[in-house]
Amino acid sequence: MHELTVNGVQIAFERQQGTSTPPLVLIHGFPLDHSSWDALLPHLEGADVLLPDLRGCGESAVVDGAYTIADMAEDVIALLDALKIEKAAIVGHSMGGYVALEIARKVPGRVSGLGLVSTQALPDTPERKAGRYATAEKVGDQGSDVVAASMAPKLSADPQHVSALRELIQRQPAAGMMGALAAMAERPDSTDLLSTFKFPVVIVHGLADGLIPVERSREMKALIPQASLTEIPDVGHMPMLDAPTETAKALKDGLLSS
């Protein structure tokens, strides 16, 4: 892992060097880290790929106090600045999709294309927001294990993948998990943003996703004329893990020029 202090936060990241353009930034979801993309990397051979750990996740620093999805986006933008990456294709999975949308809101001129994997533009409903805060309270009392036990089985139908995901979630800092839950609960509605995109947009969603229904991706596609939508049968919330070939093809075809 590499580490840089950007936007006042120590951010850890991996870099797969490649010759294809533009660079591809893969932003992980909750409650994971950059390694959630590992199964996809062999299918992106030759691509220049940047994989950050968001603040409070993986090897990145845990930040005291409340923060927002916009703060997470600023971290990634600052990392691009530090690495002298002027323009990149930004891909986000689930919570990472919220961060990717915020990057597109803040610096659209630096986004060559956008990938939205198992995510949505809508904000939390009041019920979902309350549920996130209740989960954060449980994490504060019981640690990361409580989320690992409940969420890992919802991420994949493959027992081996579920076991590995449970271990990955257990490794995540409880404080960072609580911060991310609050940030997601307070994220804005990005629906009106979608029609402003002038760059290519690739949307990928598993038809068996039990966390964010595929209808959310279909709604986004309807608002982005140039967007492609790849729906993958029998795949849940993590198509990059359960269907890496199809996911990589969609991203390469839509976002990489060479």
Please place each PLM-identified region on the residue numbering.
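Conserved acidic catalytic loop of the alpha/beta-hydrolase fold
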Residues: A70-A88
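Conserved HGGG/HGGXW glycine-rich cap/lid loop of the alpha/beta-hydrolase fold
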Residues: N7-G65, I69, L79
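Short beta-strand/loop motif that positions the catalytic acidic residue
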Residues: F197, I203-H205, D209
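Catalytic histidine neighborhood in serine/cysteine hydrolases
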Residues: V214, R218-H237
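Alpha/beta-hydrolase fold catalytic core
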Residues: M1-L24, E45-D48, I85-E86, R171, ...
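Conserved alpha/beta-hydrolase catalytic His-Asp/Glu region
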Residues: D124-A130, D141-T196
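Conserved hydrolase catalytic core segment
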Residues: L83-T125
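Catalytic histidine-centered segment of alpha/beta-hydrolase-like enzymes
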Residues: V235-A248
